[in-house]
């Protein structure tokens, strides 16, 4: 019983346990068993590569053209500034402050010009609005001192200038508003959790193979950081064009792919790499898709990982996608988690690696019908470690398709089922 529990635990975690009774040696010197991997996928003959809806980095290949109501961007100016690239954001930041300093500097110069202060520069008996303001340059410097509140020095406002006092109040208030808006915009842009998604990994390929006697679509996710993603959740969508019964063509139709929403398996504890599984059942869009049809279909699976950054509490989202050519039929992921002395070690060198495994080539619908009719193979032998999957599958089919009766007659499985 204890052995069965340990095997079940290892299967759920998909780890390979290595004995640590001997002295630990460097990782480069360990003798790992070589496993045949396949990280490439060739396009079938006559099949042209399709444009991706989403890049592997999560960037969507969608451009909005002929937008007439561009004023809508100005109605949400804060978000528009945050979404700008850094070079444009810094340009706007510099221009806003420079323009406000120049504007109020011109007003200070205009007050001095109207009052006649510029005509009495150096006159000890004349009381100007701003002392030692002799031109536009000095007015511009006084405007900077006023708005940045660095303190007056050589130039200072006098009590005999009510219009200057009013302008001082207006510039102080507007300067505070500009500071709050621009500094807030820069702070939000700096603290955006977009870069946190750079350490969230998705496998290069998705795979389709048997798991618990059911066909499953699987892909792997991982987190490189020691600080975890809180309340992590995963969802997936199938992007595929289709035509309705009425003849309407829907390009890039989106269909939800169940990755454990009804069972809670979509809520992840992403401490170590996890394999996300989608069971291909009656509600799955892959229900009638066989291996041969997979090579002819054109679709894209978009996966979205969401959660809160542990350090800041902000929501982070990482995205990736798998084209139809990146879905490997009859493959499984190579285990990456090993049990060391006192801890578990994740080897990210094999994070994207897969190996071939015996998998029926028919669709899940036909597989379910065969199971109902009692035509399923009781067990499929595991393929040799370094290949030979095709030969092992042929031998298994030959062994179960025909059975020698005592009188020497060969009876097929369908005939035995009718008996």
Swiss-Prot record:
Residues 380-419 are annotated as: Disordered. The keyword Transport applies. It is a multi-pass membrane protein. Heteromultimer composed of KCNJ3/GIRK1 and KCNJ5/GIRK4 is activated by phosphatidylinositol 4,5 biphosphate (PtdIns(4,5)P2). It comes from the Eukaryota. Residues 136-147, 148-154 dip into the membrane without crossing it. GO terms for cellular component: external side of plasma membrane; I(KACh) inward rectifier potassium channel complex; plasma membrane; T-tubule; voltage-gated potassium channel complex. The modification Phosphoserine is found at residue 5. Residues 409-419 have a biased composition (Polar residues). It catalyses: K(+)(in) = K(+)(out). One of its GO terms (biological process) is membrane repolarization during atrial cardiac muscle cell action potential. It is found in: Membrane. Gene3D superfamilies: 1.10.287.70, G protein-activated inward rectifier potassium channel 1 (2.60.40.1400). Most abundant in heart tissue where it is found predominantly in atria. Also found in brain, kidney, liver, spleen, lung and thymus. Residues 1-86, 186-419 are cytoplasmic. The chain crosses the membrane at residues 87-111, 164-185. It holds the Pfam family IRK_C. GO terms for molecular function: G-protein activated inward rectifier potassium channel activity; inward rectifier potassium channel activity; voltage-gated potassium channel activity involved in atrial cardiac muscle cell action potential repolarization. InterPro entries: Ig_E-set, IRK_C, K_chnl_inward-rec_Kir, K_chnl_inward-rec_Kir3.4, K_chnl_inward-rec_Kir_cyto, Kir_TM. Residues 380-390 have a biased composition (Low complexity). Belongs to the inward rectifier-type potassium channel (TC 1.A.2.1) family. KCNJ5 subfamily. Associates with KCNJ3/GIRK1 or KCNJ6/GRIK2 to form a G-protein-activated heteromultimer pore-forming unit. The resulting inward current is much larger. Inward rectifier potassium channels are characterized by a greater tendency to allow potassium to flow into the cell rather than out of it. Their voltage dependence is regulated by the concentration of extracellular potassium; as external potassium is raised, the voltage range of the channel opening shifts to more positive voltages. The inward rectification is mainly due to the blockage of outward current by internal magnesium. Can be blocked by external barium. This potassium channel is controlled by G proteins. This is G protein-activated inward rectifier potassium channel 4. It comes from Rattus norvegicus (Rat). The lineage of its organism: Eukaryota, Metazoa, Chordata, Craniata, Vertebrata.
